Amino acid sequence: RNYLETERKNISDGLVIELPVKKKTSEQSEDELKPRVECRPDGVYWVTPKVDKQSGEIIRPCEWIGDRMRTVGIGHDGCDGYLIIELEPEGMEKIIYEAMPRNEIGLPSGWSRLRGRGVAVTTSQKLLNKLAEYLQREGERTQWEVTSTAGWHCGAYVMPDGEIIGVPERPVAFCGGSAAIKGYVVRGTADEWRDNVASLMRGNHSMMLGVLVGLAAPLNSLVGGGCFGVHLFAQSSAGKTTTVEAATSLYGDPEVLKLSWDATRYGLTVEAAARNDGFIPIDEIGQGGRINDIAQSAYSLFNGVGRIQGRKDGGNRAVIRWRIAALSTGEEDFETFLIKGGVTPKAGQLVRLLSVPFIDTTVFNGYDDGDQHARAIKRFASNYCGAAGREWIGWLSANKELAVSVVNEKENIWLSRLPENASPQVKRVASRFAMLDAAGELATGITGWTTGESHAAT
């Protein structure tokens, strides 16, 4: 009676009463015996629960479907829809995110895509169908930015292998792909690269300049710069290829990431888009194909815009665009190379790919001769690669305003040294070297070089 009186008083006072409700236990759940796909720490499984006839307990036999994966978002690149799938490939210590086109889910092309990313997936068609349903119907539906080009997106930097550096304003997924994706590895630390690679280049201005081109690549895009490159030329082979490998080791394995002028024009532009806002190393222009083809490739590469292409289902594909900084080498300057091949160079080509004489390496930094010195740099560039460039990009991501300010300051200094009647082409060249100068000053913590040493290299 006292209880009822108390409750009536609470109701009259406007209080909300929580009546005791008997909740279902997990054993009484209606869905407990429902077959399902489960994502576990060691993979994805098809689970078919059933009641054991003898014990009456529920047992959970399961079949393996693949490595651990789950849908964490959705996105659209302006043409196609995507599911963002979080992957944990066997043997890898990092999580990767794959933007899988919705029209590939459940098809051989989709499973091939996952396997190409290092993910193990069953060959059973029955289980693949279950996996396709799981990816489409379960998981999160957070909106992601989907891009087919690497580089700066939403305030963060997307590496050509899909790795995100920095903190994006919203989640970003990469749906493109570099032909050299396996080259974007990390071996050693940024400090080891500085102490073993950059330190051996000290005092050799042409070698240092090559590294500055690599460092300028992600910086160039932050300030809205266009595509450009530096072509180091000399009759001798004293250090040009070594320089390219050292610069390339900023971002990954030099042997895998290095390109050739023998590639097709379309191939180079697709690779440029995949490495957008990044570094393009192209060794020995004299080893390429026909000179006219190389001239066309160079023009397309530094133009920064791909060709319009039609879609199979009608209409046109989105035009691909890119910004890159390239490092090329050869025995002759680019203009002479073209003229000897019967090609009249365009002014725009020469301004975008700047020919700079390569000064022979003379400072061996503890080694007896140039051969020992070059071999050491090649060895260390392979052993300690990828970390320094990522640390540099991470620093840029956290210090964008400072980086832009230093570039603008350097550009004003370089332009102030020109005659008043300097041509627009000359001013553009000065702006390129101002960019390299700024990269050297900002990246002293990466290279270990002083600002004076970096400035002297430009």
Description of each model-found segment:
Residues 1-3, 224-240, 343-348, 407-412, ...:
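Short alpha-helical "patches" and their helix-cap loops
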Residues 374-432:
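Conserved AAA+ ATPase small/helical "lid" subdomain
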Residues 208, 217-392:
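Conserved NTP-binding/hydrolysis core of motor NTPases
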Residues 17-201, 270, 275, 339, ...:
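Conserved glycine-centered beta->alpha loop in an early N-terminal alpha/beta scaffold
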Residues 1-23, 412-414, 419-432, 437-457:
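Modules that initiate DNA replication and primer synthesis
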Residues 121, 200-209, 233-237, 284, ...:
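Short, charged/polar micro-motifs that form catalytic or ligand-binding hotspots
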Residues 168-254, 433:
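P-loop NTPase catalytic core of nucleic-acid-dependent motor ATPases
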Residues 175-184, 196-203, 258-268, 310-313, ...:
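Active-site-adjacent structural elements in folded domains
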